[in-house]
Regions:
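Bacterial N-terminal signal peptides that target proteins for export
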Residues: 2-12
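C-terminal motif of bacterial Sec signal peptides marking the signal peptidase cleavage site
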Residues: 22-25
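Sec-dependent N-terminal signal peptides
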Residues: 11-19
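C-terminal outer-membrane beta-barrel translocator/porin domains of Gram-negative envelope proteins
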Residues: 373-384, 498-691, 696-723, 762-765, ...
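Short glycine-rich, acidic/polar surface loops and turns
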Residues: 394, 729-737
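Interaction-mediating elements
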Residues: 27-331, 448
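Gram-negative/organellar outer-membrane beta-barrel architecture
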Residues: 157-162, 298-299, 318-559, 641-642, ...
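Flexible glycine-/small-residue-rich
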Residues: 46-48, 137-141, 152-154, 246-250, ...
Length: 784
């Protein structure tokens, strides 16, 4: 088997390296007009002292302003080979139009003193007249906002705008941009519509811009004052500014400046695709808290439907209540479509009727899926392991007519050793879960939670049982029961806060060791603290913050989790009769930063975690390590890819790599630090079906014991900040990825650039790095 793997790995390495090397590739013109110059390339060069990121952003915007006759269409038929399909005939008029378009954009971005020049050249190659067009852009100094005022000719609107002025997007000294002015007017429209002004729209606002002092043209002004203002205006030539005043476009449109109220709220919760709300008399009608519910199939409880509506009869119209109602229903995962319509009454009462139409999805569905895994050695097997599994799932999307989600899953699978002892592992598991679309807590707690500000709120109840039989080593039975709450707050579309709290998480593991495992535990005593029968009764607290940039180009994702087991429950003696209750505290944090470009992306990740066990075994000996299913590990397709799964570490201790009985043993630690950098880019499309992608990556990190208790076997395995550089491992490699839209397959190839096991030799840098001695990883979807 190993002789077969070598040529496969060599092939993958050569393939990935070759594809990466030819990314620039060649361009082959197709279907161009003969004997006429055609547009082969168009380049934009921006000059000036602009920051690199700002210059790149401006260049992208300018490229979008090019005339269509200067834009080329490149189609990748295979990595490195791109066809220039039907390139347009070069026309100087297109270049002149592009200059006008780009100047308009620069003015919109505050560059009123910009200059644009262009030139072209024609290269003859194989009877092709290839025209290259080059634009040189000198933006000059950009204008900045000076004074920003509201002059709304309606006292109520003016007062409301001034009361929320702190939220204005226009700030004095900020670079001028039409986009920012537009965003500020959108903010005002949203503010007004959230305060009853149902008919108010963007067309009702106008932004007046002024780059000169209006006082200079005032004939009644004192001459000395005019002279002072003139000198001030001249000084501003060096630092140009813009005054902005936002006002009503048509103050006479009085109907747009009236507050509207909601008369009726009519909800149709179970419409069929061919049903029409106009047939309402045929439906059963129920009124709950003034809300009219028209049901034909009686699929939902009226009280439940009414509780999800933030639109209430007699209340002031607020756009956010309409949006919140829409979110409340769509987040249930029970409806395939939800629409909300406001119907204005044809009288002078300034009222609307809210009509909510919902189309439920199929109540139950059954799924059957298969999965496969590949692993090169683990704690008790040294061969190549291949696993196959079969999954059966039954989902109910509307339990008890309250959109409660239930899911039942049965999985069974085997893991075979391709080298010997064919069937290595047999595993089966059964899980059942409920997801309630609300927080099920006592009223005295619920009163202190502002549920109206939450975008989603869920209560999660999970049950899971599993049986694993590892040939010659052990049989393992496990049971898990948990209760959890999850809530997401997202007042702004680009920012979300998600909290997760599990007050009760029970995990029981019953281990029946066999002779081979006992021999292994004798060789590696530390594993005895991890591999035994045990009980976890813990509470888990988690928080996740996601922020996306205004243009979607940047994204931050931060997650932190805390778990504690055995603190309070350890006081109940019956739960710890045989000292099987695990006591520990564990915390971990994960931060990811994404920078997306047009055809590539940069991703940075930092991860860190620590677990502190504080229990004692039945002999009174203090536990040294976390249970294996709560420990940290590194290596594999999702962590430190230059190492096999759970084969990195521990620290710089050579014990696990040199001791005969410890080789290939899984490494579990109490502390983990890891950092990753990945540059992702597109290669092209294969047969117009599969999107081929690639990546260059670097992984940095390791795992450690919190303490070794002075055991000489594990010198270098404990964490010490003073030897962090010595202990850190560094791996780097490349990847070939096939993106099928719904999932992505990764073929990663990585090298150990710094192996802490050999820290005595140049800190382990480039120890035995050879072309074919890399590590292959097969992964599904992105590593992070």
């Amino acid at each position: 088997m190993h002789s077969l793997c070598k040529p496969v790995k060599l092939y993958l390495f050569v393939l990935i390296t070759s594809l990466t090397a030819i990314i620039p590739g060649c361009i082959v013109p197709k279907k161009y007009q003969q004997n006429k110059p055609f547009v082969y390339s168009t380049n934009i060069n921006i000059q000036g002292n602009l920051p690199v990121s700002e210059k790149a952003d401006l260049k992208l915007k300018l490229e979008n302003q090019l005339d269509d006759s200067l834009k080329t269409v490149l189609k990748t038929v295979f990595p490195g080979i791109r066809f220039l399909v039907k390139p347009p005939v070069f026309d100087t008029a297109a270049a002149l139009r592009s200059v006008i378009f780009m100047n308009n954009l620069l003015h919109a971005q505050g560059y009123y003193k910009s200059t644009i020049t262009w030139d072209s050249s024609i290269t003859i190659k194989e009877k092709q007249q290839r025209a290259s067009v080059n634009f040189t852009v000198v933006p000059g100094k950009s204008y900045k906002f000076d004074s920003v005022n509201y002059r709304l000719q309606d006292s109520a609107l003016q007062m409301l705008a001034l009361s929320r002025r702190n939220g204005s997007l226009l700030k004095k000294g900020q670079p001028y941009s039409v986009d920012i002015i537009s965003a500020e007017m959108d903010r005002l429209v949203e503010l007004f519509r959230n305060n009853g002004y149902y008919k108010f729209s963007r067309d009702d606002l106008n932004a007046e811009r002024d780059t000169v002092f209006s006082a200079l043209i005032n004939p009644s002004l004192d001459p000395f004052e005019q002279l002072r203002l003139l000198q001030q205006a001249r000084s501003r030539q060096q630092n140009p500014v813009m005054n902005v005043t936002i006002q009503l476009r048509n103050p006479d449109a009085v109907s747009h400046f009236r507050k509207y109220y909601i008369r009726n709220v009519n909800i149709y919760p179970d419409l069929g695709l061919l049903d029409d709300s106009a047939s309402a008399p045929k439906y059963d009608s129920v009124t709950v808290n003034g809300i009219h519910i028209f049901s034909r199939y009686n699929k939902f409880k009226p009280e439940f439907i009414a509780s999800k509506s933030s639109l209430q009869p007699g209340s002031l119209f607020r756009l956010r209540n309409s949006a919140r109602t829409y979110t409340n229903f769509t987040q249930l995962n029970t409806f395939i479509q939800v629409t909300i319509e406001m119907i204005e009454l044809q009288d002078s009462s300034a009222r609307v009727d809210a009509v909510i139409k919902m189309y439920p999805s199929v109540k139950q569905d059954l799924s059957v899926t298969a999965d496969a895994s590949y692993n090169t050695g683990d704690i008790i097997a040294t061969g190549d392991l291949f696993g196959v599994g079969l999954n059966f799932g039954l989902n109910n999307h509307n339990v008890a007519k309250q959109a409660i989600q239930s899911s039942t899953n049965l999985r069974t699978g085997v893991e075979v050793n391709l080298g010997s002892n064919f069937i290595q592992t047999f595993q089966t598991s059964l899980s059942h879960s409920y997801t309630f679309p609300r927080l099920i807590v006592p009223d005295f707690i619920l009163r202190h939670i502002k549920t109206d500000s939450l975008r989603t709120q869920r209560t999660l109840l999970n049950f899971n049982g599993a049986y694993t039989d590892r040939k010659d080593f052990y049989s393992l039975k496990s049971l898990n029961v948990s209760l959890a709450y999850q809530a997401t707050k997202s007042r702004r579309l680009r920012k979300s806060h998600t909290w997760y709290f599990s007050p009760l998480n029970v995990e029981y593991v019953l281990l029946n060791p066999r002779d081979q495992l006992k021999l292994l535990l004798d060789s590696v005593p530390n594993l005895q603290f991890s591999f035994n029968t045990g009980l976890v009764i813990s509470s888990i607290l988690g928080y996740n913050y996601i922020q996306t940039g205004t243009d979607g180009a940047k994204k931050n994702d931060f997650r932190i989790g805390l778990e504690e087991s055995g603190g309070l429950t350890g006081m109940i003696k019956t739960l710890d009769r045989d000292a099987n209750l695990y006591r520990f505290v564990k915390i971990d944090a994960d931060f990811k930063h994404y920078i997306n470009y047009k055809k590539s992306a940069l991703v940075f990740r930092l991860y860190g975690g620590i677990g502190v066990p504080y229990g004692r075994d039945k002999d009174g000996v203090r536990e040294q390590q976390l249970p294996f299913f709560k420990s940290f590990y590194a290596g594999g397709p999702y962590s430190m890819r230059a190492w096999q799964v759970r084969q990195l570490g521990i620290g710089s201790s050579p014990y696990f790599d040199t001791a005969v009985n410890a080789r290939n043993v899984d490494r579990f630690g109490d502390i983990q630090l890891e950092g990753n950098i990945e540059y992702r880019f597109n290669l092209g499309t294969l047969f117009n079906v599969v999107k081929l992608k690639s990546a260059l990556f670097t992984d940095i990190g390791n795992i450690w014991y919190r303490t070794t208790q002075g055991n000489p076997k594990y010198i270098g395995a404990d964490f010490n900040i003073n030897k962090l550089y010595t202990d850190i491992a560094v791996g780097a490699g490349t990847s070939l990825r096939a993106d099928f839209d719904y999932f992505l397959i990764r073929f990663d190839w990585a090298y150990k650039l710094k192996d802490p096991v050999y820290s005595n030799d140049n800190y382990g840098w480039f120890h035995d790095v050879q072309l074919l001695k890399g590590q292959f990883q097969l992964g599904i979807n992105y590593p992070f």
